[in-house]
């Protein structure tokens, strides 16, 4: 059971629903969103900001919180529903592919103090982590996360650490080869950053298996359903912290089925920060037809995606306050 300050708890209460579950919308994408829009036309920073505003305005009445970035997302933060809490991302988008290690970097003109002043109920930081990479690289990452944990402790707002695992020797995270090692990569990273020294309050993590390689889910079976369920159990046992799942760009249907599978496996996950699975198909009408068409999609299909996800969460996730004092 993790103990947090009264102030941190108040902020955390702003991010959960009435069952203590985090049903949050993630649209802190910057590079990825620019690429999604850029498939159809040249996009401006204003258009990226405008799309985030529409997503926030249309969908936050149905979500417990929204995750945004301070670069393109502050207008969207102001346009969220009053019932929806706010997480702000602290990391720079992407990583320098020319340098080994996918090293973390925070936004130049931001600090946790400034995120809090901008209205954030929590600081989110994305870390790419390969537990089997060199000690020289991983020690730098550990020290970096210690610093952010200390900042969040000083400012008394929750620290959400998003961990995206990878293999330094295999750049294809969708491959069968990576699927074989993914459970080890995800679970060991969670064990490391659950240590008290990092002052992490909530982990945002991947599901421990690539569901496309689970019997009955994908075209090729690498794991039986029993084996996959065992990994979900191992993941829950790897941390005493609340943890939530990221959607990793899969479809809305696949994400919902994955959460049902996690529940069946006995996972004690505490919610989601769901991004592209919710809003990705709204990009095309926005870029090709404008705001009105995007709103029409968001108010129908987008809202349905959120409502269906919320129903699955109510039936499968566990309150964060079962793990926090």
Swiss-Prot record:
Entries under SUPFAM superfamilies matching the protein: Aldolase
Disulfide bonds: none
Pathway: Carbohydrate metabolism; D-tagatose 6-phosphate degradation; D-glyceraldehyde 3-phosphate and glycerone phosphate from D-tagatose 6-phosphate: step 2/2
EC main group: lyase
Reaction(s) catalysed (UniProt annotation): D-tagatofuranose 1,6-bisphosphate = D-glyceraldehyde 3-phosphate + dihydroxyacetone phosphate
Pfam families linked: DeoC
GO BP annotation list: 6-sulfoquinovose(1-) catabolic process; D-tagatose 6-phosphate catabolic process; lactose catabolic process via tagatose-6-phosphate
Domain of life per record: Bacteria
Record's keyword terms, sorted: Lactose metabolism, Lyase
Matching NCBIfam families: lacD (TIGR01232), PRK04161.1 (NF003180), PRK12399.1 (NF009065), PRK12858.1 (NF009498)
Alphabetized PANTHER family for the sequence: SULFOFRUCTOSEPHOSPHATE ALDOLASE (PTHR39340:SF1)
UniProt-recorded name of the protein: Tagatose 1,6-diphosphate aldolase 1
């Amino acid at each position: 059971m993790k103990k947090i300050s009264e102030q941190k708890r108040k902020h955390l209460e702003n991010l959960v629903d009435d069952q203590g579950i985090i049903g949050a919308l993630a649209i802190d994408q910057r590079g990825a969103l620019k690429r999604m829009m850029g498939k159809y036309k040249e996009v401006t920073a204003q258009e990226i900001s405008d799309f985030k505003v529409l997503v926030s305005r249309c969908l936050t009445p149905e979500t417990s919180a929204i995750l945004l970035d301070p670069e393109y997302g502050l207008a969207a933060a102001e346009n969220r529903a009053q019932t929806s809490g706010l997480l702000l991302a602290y990391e720079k988008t992407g990583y320098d592919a020319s340098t080994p290690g996918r090293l973390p970097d925070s936004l130049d003109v931001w600090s946790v103090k400034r995120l809090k002043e901008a209205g954030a109920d929590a600081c989110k930081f994305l870390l790419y982590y390969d537990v089997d990479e060199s000690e020289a690289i991983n020690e730098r990452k550990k020290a970096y996360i210690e610093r952010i944990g200390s900042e969040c402790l000083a400012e008394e707002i929750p620290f959400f650490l998003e961990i995206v695992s990878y293999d330094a020797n295999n750049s294809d995270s969708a491959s069968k080869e990576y699927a074989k090692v993914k459970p080890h990569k995800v679970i060991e990273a969670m064990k490391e950053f659950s240590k008290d020294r990092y002052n992490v309050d909530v982990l945002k993590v991947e599901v421990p298996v690539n569901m496309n390689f689970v019997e009955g889910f994908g075209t090729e079976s690498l794991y039986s359903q029993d084996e996959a369920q065992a990994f979900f159990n191992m993941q829950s046992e790897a941390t005493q912290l609340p943890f939530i799942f990221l959607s990793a760009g899969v479809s809305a249907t696949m994400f919902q089925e994955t959460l049902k599978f996690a529940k069946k496996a006995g996972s004690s996950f505490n919610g989601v920060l769901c991004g592209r699975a919710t809003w990705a198909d709204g990009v095309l009408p926005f870029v090709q037809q404008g705001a009105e068409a995007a709103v029409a999609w968001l108010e129908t299909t987008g809202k349905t995606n959120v409502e269906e996800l919320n129903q699955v969460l109510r039936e499968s996730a566990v309150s964060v306050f079962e793990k926090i004092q």
